[in-house]
């Protein structure tokens, strides 16, 4: 008699969830201390002035100010430029 071999279970069909990496505060955006500027794996972007880096390479603001991107020596740095305080009226 002709028999069909039992179909095995597929070894494909799995996928991991997206990790929501990338820039969270773009150039020109105002940030306050502790705001996350970028989530990344490795150092796609490097911390510049007034920016800290977490153990998972997350970049965050250390002061209140405006986010700036600048390139130097084949690297992209992210800095936070302080905003001049408003004159009291």
UniProtKB/Swiss-Prot annotation:
What GO biological process terms does the UniProt entry carry, in alphabetical order? Answer: translation
| Region spans: Disordered | 1-21
Which keywords appear in this protein's UniProt record, sorted alphabetically? Ribonucleoprotein, Ribosomal protein
One Gene Ontology molecular-function label = structural constituent of ribosome
Q: Which PROSITE patterns match?
A: RIBOSOMAL_L27
What InterPro entries would the database entry show? Ribosomal_bL27 (IPR001684), Ribosomal_bL27_CS (IPR018261)
An example of a Gene Ontology cellular component annotation for this protein is: cytosolic large ribosomal subunit
Q: Name one Pfam family in it.
A: Ribosomal_L27
Task: Spell out the family assignment given in the record's similarity comment.
Answer: Belongs to the bacterial ribosomal protein bL27 family.
PANTHER family given for it? LARGE RIBOSOMAL SUBUNIT PROTEIN BL27M, RIBOSOMAL PROTEIN L27
UniProt protein name = Large ribosomal subunit protein bL27
Native source organism of the sequence: Bradyrhizobium sp. (strain ORS 278)
From the UniProt record, report the name of the gene that encodes this protein. rpmA
